[in-house]
Amino acid sequence: MKYTKADTAIIKNATIGNGSTIWHYANLYDCKIGENCTVGSYVEIQNNVEIGDNVTVSSHSFICSLVKIEDDVFVGHGVMTINDLHPPSFRRTGSKRDWGSTCIKKGAVIGSNATIFPVTIGENTKIGAGAVVTTDIPPNCVAVGNPAKIIKNKGKP
């Protein structure tokens, strides 16, 4: 695979597609990154994460285990994903049974500083900056706020 990596990036057991760029101080662990992706500076992507093709994960974002990001998604600066519904469940119990998965569908846009709980964000949906997404958001919608509420439902594209 031919991709570009900054000297300061840490990549351990990650699969990275052709044409992708990994910027300074990014940390990638046991994850899969598609083709023509950009992973910004100071991003952490944990194990069991799958990222499709043509995805941008902007600087200072945290993509935790059990997240799937489909093709053509834009993740803004400082976006945080959460998988532990009752922290610190793993430390407390040694079990990941309280963990949930997140799926961000094709063409979605996640605004800067959004927090994404274990949910599904529909195709072509836009999440506003600073939103806290605690429930599934259907396709072709715009959701903003804390907690995130749908303010526009565009229906089928």
Language-model segment annotations:
Residues 143:
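Conserved active-site beta-strand element of glycosyltransferases/polysaccharide synthases
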